[in-house]
Amino acid sequence: MHPRFQTAFAQLADNLQSALAPILADHHFPAMLTAEQVSTLKNTAGLDEDALAFALLPLAAACARTDLSHFNVGAIARGVSGNWYFGANMEFLGATMQQTVHAEQSAISHAWLRGEKGLAAVTVNYTPCGHCRQFMNELNSGLDLRIHLPGRAPHTLRDYLPDAFGPKDLEIKTLLMDEQDHGFTLTGDTLTQAAITAANKSHMPYSHSPSGVALECKDGRIFTGSYAENAAFNPTLPPLQGALNLLSLNGYDYADIQRAILAEKGDAALIQWDATAATLKALGCHNIDRVLLG
């Protein structure tokens, strides 16, 4: 078990500990539960779906990287597939505050990058900030997405974001988590192809500036992130943050990164290179390359 989970795990009910122990045994537990695992945990612990999600929130919050605020937020995105995806807030010392990833963004990006097609609910241990409410409004679940908070009745995003502005106001039909493939040809080595594949998945209906990042760890593991734009622009999630989020959720540290590649168009309206390189260098990675999409 990764050390970050030990305190939260020790506070769980005994029957839930017994069911979770073999799942968490892997140091690189992927911070997600399959639909089958969720069903097993519910039956073993005698909890309904909502109660189980609340019980697991401390494990999600344990994944937070909060060197600046020391305020851990955890979230669980519940996919329409039945799979659950952990998320937690991330802060990057030496970079800018704008690079921060919020817990809801973390869980949603986690689900999206693992191929989830839509979300039924998000469970989070603190009220979503306005930034996250706007981020969630980009999803194909729209304002019907259920939001669950401890000690409160469940509400929809519509309740938390009245008079919402979103992609439909801009006549955008393809939403975040809808399947997309922009068709750029895969070239180069495995890491380069992974970055291009991530760029092909980008949600960028406003700038038409696709981008993707691939990070290679010293053990050969590769994590990718795709660009996710937002109708309100500022809640947009850059591709590097998506990749760093997956890397961290899987129990890796920034020091494990040995190489990074950004794939983007050289003539795009928005360029990720400077911000991507600056953030990676702040985290200790200097082996950074860029491949231009044709």
Swiss-Prot record:
<dbReference type="InterPro" id="IPR013171">
    <property type="entry name" value="Cyd/dCyd_deaminase_Zn-bd"/>
</dbReference>
<keyword id="KW-0479">Metal-binding</keyword>
<dbReference type="InterPro" id="IPR016192">
    <property type="entry name" value="APOBEC/CMP_deaminase_Zn-bd"/>
</dbReference>
<comment type="function">
    <text>This enzyme scavenges exogenous and endogenous cytidine and 2'-deoxycytidine for UMP synthesis.</text>
</comment>
<feature type="domain" description="CMP/dCMP-type deaminase 1">
    <location>
        <begin position="48"/>
        <end position="168"/>
    </location>
</feature>
<feature type="binding site">
    <location>
        <position position="132"/>
    </location>
    <ligand>
        <name>Zn(2+)</name>
    </ligand>
</feature>
<dbReference type="GO" id="GO:0008270">
    <property type="term" value="F:zinc ion binding"/>
</dbReference>
<keyword id="KW-0378">Hydrolase</keyword>
<comment type="subunit">
    <text>Homodimer.</text>
</comment>
<dbReference type="GO" id="GO:0005829">
    <property type="term" value="C:cytosol"/>
</dbReference>
<protein>
    <recommendedName>
        <fullName>Cytidine deaminase</fullName>
        <ecNumber>3.5.4.5</ecNumber>
    </recommendedName>
</protein>
<feature type="domain" description="CMP/dCMP-type deaminase 2">
    <location>
        <begin position="186"/>
        <end position="294"/>
    </location>
</feature>
<keyword id="KW-0862">Zinc</keyword>
<dbReference type="InterPro" id="IPR006263">
    <property type="entry name" value="Cyt_deam_dimer"/>
</dbReference>
<dbReference type="InterPro" id="IPR020797">
    <property type="entry name" value="Cytidine_deaminase_bacteria"/>
</dbReference>
<dbReference type="InterPro" id="IPR050202">
    <property type="entry name" value="Cyt/Deoxycyt_deaminase"/>
</dbReference>
<dbReference type="GO" id="GO:0042802">
    <property type="term" value="F:identical protein binding"/>
</dbReference>
<feature type="binding site">
    <location>
        <position position="129"/>
    </location>
    <ligand>
        <name>Zn(2+)</name>
    </ligand>
</feature>
<dbReference type="GO" id="GO:0009972">
    <property type="term" value="P:cytidine deamination"/>
</dbReference>
<dbReference type="InterPro" id="IPR002125">
    <property type="entry name" value="CMP_dCMP_dom"/>
</dbReference>
<dbReference type="Pfam" id="PF08211">
    <property type="entry name" value="dCMP_cyt_deam_2"/>
</dbReference>
<feature type="active site" description="Proton donor">
    <location>
        <position position="104"/>
    </location>
</feature>
<dbReference type="InterPro" id="IPR016193">
    <property type="entry name" value="Cytidine_deaminase-like"/>
</dbReference>
<feature type="binding site">
    <location>
        <begin position="89"/>
        <end position="91"/>
    </location>
    <ligand>
        <name>substrate</name>
    </ligand>
</feature>
<dbReference type="GO" id="GO:0004126">
    <property type="term" value="F:cytidine deaminase activity"/>
</dbReference>
<comment type="similarity">
    <text>Belongs to the cytidine and deoxycytidylate deaminase family.</text>
</comment>
<feature type="binding site">
    <location>
        <position position="102"/>
    </location>
    <ligand>
        <name>Zn(2+)</name>
    </ligand>
</feature>
<dbReference type="Pfam" id="PF00383">
    <property type="entry name" value="dCMP_cyt_deam_1"/>
</dbReference>
